Amino acid sequence: MATALTVTRSPAAVLARLPLVGVFARLVGPAALTAAGMIGAGAVATRLLAGAWFGFDLLWVALYVVPMVVFTLDSASRVGVITGRGMFEMIRSDIGAWLAWFIFAPTLLVNVIVNMSQMSAMVEGAYGAFGTLPPVGADRGAGLVVVTVVLTAATAGAAVFGGYKRVEKIMTALLLVILACFIVVAIKGLLDWQTWVALGGGLVPQIPPDIAVVGTGRTRSGFMQVLAIAGQALPPSVLLAYGYLATNSGQRVGDLKAAYWKTVQNLGVIWGLFSVVVIVAGATALHAVYTGSGPTYFGVSHYSQIESIPVAGQVLGPALGFLAPRFFSLGLIAAGFTTLISVSLTMTYFCLDMAGRDWRFTRENRPFQLLFALWIVVPALIAPIWQLPALLKAIIAMIGNLVLAPVAVLLILYFVNRPALGEHRAGAGRNLVLGITALFALGLVVNGIRGLFL
């Protein structure tokens, strides 16, 4: 009997016995899966570089989108759990196939780019863990290919053969580790009272002026960084997929209230806290330190020049000293891993639902497992073709995410007010938040498009 117990005990069960880890076990669920997936390379890049480049000026964006995310995702959860239908099936049958394809096609293309950016972050993180940068130009060769293949195989194997519940638990554990790293640095930065004054100023909505990248002819755009933060917070694929996740996790109508509070815990508190502390860490440990007259690392002496993972890893310097770049690089591997899996899971739901196939993640659903693996493997293996620093790739992917966000929010607003939801239809307060979210996203998209032609 003792032997049997030892054999069947899962790694998650062992972790749950460690101090503090068990306290967070109750957070596991689709909200934790989504939160962990949203604390990926895109989240780190958009917020850390916002803090590094613009100080606290963009803190308001990261903070104000939190309630938008919570209410939008909880509304999507209601729709999925009560109807038991996939979002794309509902769009096809209740509105029209034309709209389903209008959303699906660009979502597919954007998420190929997102997954490429996540694998690039993992590869650059792997090199950064050894204190180097990936080879570029003519130096790119077999070594880069081997690292990419190994990381791709490890990610696909862990995701596909672990099962849905195991994926949830892996995501939750990684979520907590990544969050803890940044909290330490942010707390140290907040010990200076002047930091609080600057932080307060960052709560006032503003678009900081563009800054010139020292030593080059390039600039960093404050508005583009706003688009990137909002695009990472309101990705249409995550918003539309949340109902699938809630249904797949076994939620029932009676679980909706408890599920709402889990969403508040995971997205409102943990992910929201992450968003704030990463900007605080970037502002205090990078923006205030790399001023051009201070330290130099990999040839970078000014905050405007920061764009590679090892240099950005200096953000953990106040807590970890010389180990900071290596530890940060390992964290980026974990962050890229979570989002790569989360996005692949989301797109597998969408593809199977569009094809009218079973979209539930079970060990018996072989088409799901095959497509899930392909969504990890194909973008990951072609990632080296795109030659940009990984953090800049992530920012570009997040900006692309925002384009369909207004449509996704409006669809959720439509379905959460349908008579089929009965007593769980949205009330005035929820509709107000969803309406503000749609207008906020639409305003950013319109201004972004206008900026391209003016």
Q: Each predicted region: which residue ranges?
A:
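Selective recognition of specific alpha-helical transmembrane segments in multi-pass small-molecule
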Residues: 60-75, 184, 234, 260-288
